[in-house]
Curated annotation (Swiss-Prot):
Name listed for the protein in its UniProt record: Heparanase-like protein 2
Ligase listed as a keyword: no
Membrane topology: Peripheral membrane protein
Keywords of this entry: Glycoprotein, Hydrolase, Lysosome, Membrane, Secreted, Signal
One Pfam family matching this protein: Glyco_hydro_79n
Signal peptide range: 1-21
SUPFAM superfamilies: (Trans)glycosidases (SSF51445)
Family as reported in the entry's similarity comment: Belongs to the glycosyl hydrolase 79 family.
Length: 539
């Protein structure tokens, strides 16, 4: 008996420390497990690979290096392991320069050369080339790492510039068709083909009218049917990969019609420019973060009213545009924005969310030279492993600084709760209720023996559990040394860094008595897994 008490007391050292001197606020989450309010794709988490060459610069900084599809070091063991850790990570190949990429296959009318800086090119660059030798290398890498590939096609090929940003003329699909034929002949698996990048509406540097775009999607669909006529499965058609304008998007669905466009994609950079001095303030402002909800609701409504056959994806989202915010996007603080937006978007039936970028800029999930994961990488990996497809409704008595999102757990019973504490001074003690009874209590309500009390508070690391009390898993995320701009994230107090053998570290929870309270420290993030929560919608 005495020995057991000593063991329990020793294990108390594993508990995430409650921040002393902070305010304490008790709150209850009321979770409706009877129905799903929305649903994501099985592979909701996605990351992009861009085309930017090393000469891409913003604000006198050039943060891309060798991070493009054309020059990325595919021989890096850590890069491969970072993707393999997801088992099935969707990778969207695309970006600003995709509508200037020529595929070096078939009968080309002009030489296929690499991107060069030029004053008269879109985004300050000439056309670029994807050589088939490189395409072979990329596909061997994707096959070895289990990646699910979405490829962004050049939608300006054959067109001519009219005036301003407008481009006209028919899309020349021959280069795309030759490229697809080569891809199929090699047996390379492409899950989906995306048409164009940021050409919708008024565009960024270039735009195509919705009338032309709708017509071209029908052409693309027929090209895919022809190229894949002997294939058991056919890739999805994805478009337009632009910034949402309700009228333009609605018209695109109407003009292309049922059975053509499978996925409607839009881009988000709601934090503004990467050099905004108020970037951190925006990330920590719950009202600012919530402002994006209307956009997701409008996209969802547009699909329901004008194209219920299509799914909504976020095709590209980096938080801050122009390569992200230096010493912000690659640090712990960015996970407040990133995870919160994953939560908001999923509540509005967003099926896939592609983060800009896997590598490159300041917003890369991986450091561009070493491929060492940045904090958002681990946030994405935890979401991918823990958060299932089904989203449940949740109400809370807490202030707006405590963000709560609830999903069915992934490939297991019960639910997973994502809690984000944006408060600088308040520790939240969280109880959970299914609307009928309190499942987790914010404080102990009945007298227990000393040993029972210790057992309900203690936390275990790994799979160890002494009895039925110990069946709640917690993943508490915080920055190293309390520095929100640290590039090192702590999981339950332990630094998340590659192992001595160059592997992605294990993401192990602490386990608590299911009836003990959940503590969420100021400026921290937690995933809470409740395998015994009764949620019929998750069956």
């Amino acid at each position: 008996m005495g020995f057991n008490v000593v063991v329990f007391l020793s294990c108390l050292l594993l508990l995430p420390p409650v921040t002393f001197g902070s305010n304490m606020e008790r709150t209850t989450l009321v979770i409706d497990g009877s129905r799903r309010i929305a649903e994501t794709d099985e592979n909701f988490i996605c990351a992009t690979l861009d085309w930017w060459p090393p000469e891409k610069c913003n604000y006198d900084q050039c943060p891309w290096g060798y991070a493009s599809l054309i020059n990325l070091n595919l021989a890096s063991p850590l890069l491969a392991k970072a993707i393999q850790a997801f088992r099935t990570l969707r990778i969207r190949i695309g970006g600003s320069l995709q509508d200037q990429v020529i595929y070096d296959v078939g009968d080309l009318k002009t030489p296929c050369t690499q991107f060069k800086k030029t004053d008269d090119g879109l985004f300050g660059f000439s056309e670029g080339c994807l050589y088939m030798k490189r395409w072979d290398e990329v596909n061997h890498f994707f096959n070895a790492t289990g990646a699910i590939v979405t490829f962004g096609l050049n939608a300006l090929h054959g067109r001519n510039k009219l005036n301003g940003t407008a481009w006209g003329g028919d899309w020349d699909h021959t280069n795309t068709q030759d490229f697809m034929n080569y891809t199929v002949s090699k047996g390379y698996a492409i899950d989906s083909w995306e048409f164009g990048n940021e050409l919708s509406g008024s565009g960024i540097w270039a735009s195509v009218s919705v009338e032309l775009y709708g017509k071209d999607l029908i052409v693309l669909k027929n090209v895919i049917k022809n190229v894949y006529k002997n294939s058991r499965t056919k890739p999805l058609v994805v478009a337009p990969g632009g910034f949402f304008e309700e009228q333009w998007y609605s018209e695109l669905l109407r003009l292309s019609g049922p059975g053509v466009l499978d996925v409607l994609t839009h881009h988000i950079y709601n934090l503004g420019p990467g050099n905004d001095p108020k970037l951190v303030n925006k990330i920590l402002d719950p009202n600012y973060l919530s402002g994006i909800s209307e956009l997701f609701a409008n996209v969802n409504q547009t699909i329901q009213e004008h194209g219920p056959w299509a799914a909504a994806w976020v095709g590209e989202a980096g938080g801050a545009f122009n390569s992200g915010g230096r010493q912000v996007s690659e640090t712990f603080i960015n996970s407040f924005w990133y995870l919160d937006q994953l939560g908001i978007s999923s509540k509005h039936n967003t099926k896939v969310y592609c983060r800009q970028a896997l590598v490159g800029g300041f917003y890369g999930l991986l450091e561009k030279e070493t491929f060492v994961p940045n904090p958002d990488y681990y946030s994405a990996l935890l979401w991918h492993r823990l958060m299932g497809k089904g989203i449940l409704g949740v109400q809370t008595t807490a202030s707006e600084y405590l963000r709560a999102y609830v999903h069915c757990s992934k490939r297991r019973a019960g639910i997973t709760i994502l809690l984000i504490n944006l408060s600088k001074h308040t520790t939240f003690t969280v109880a959970v209720s299914n609307g009928v009874k309190v499942v987790l209590q914010a404080e102990s309500m009945k007298r227990k023996s000393f040993l029972e009390t210790i057992k309900s508070k203690v936390s275990w690391v790994g799979n160890k559990a002494s009895d039925g009390y110990l069946n709640r898993e917690e993943y508490h995320l915080s920055p190293k040394d309390g520095d929100l701009r640290s590039k090192i994230m702590l999981l339950n107090g332990k630094p998340l860094v590659p192992t001595a053998t160059g592997d992605i570290p294990k993401l192990e929870p602490v386990r608590h008595g299911v009836k003990s309270p959940v503590y969420i420290n100021p400026l921290s993030i937690s995933f809470i897994v409740l395998p015994t929560f009764d949620a019929p919608a998750c069956s």
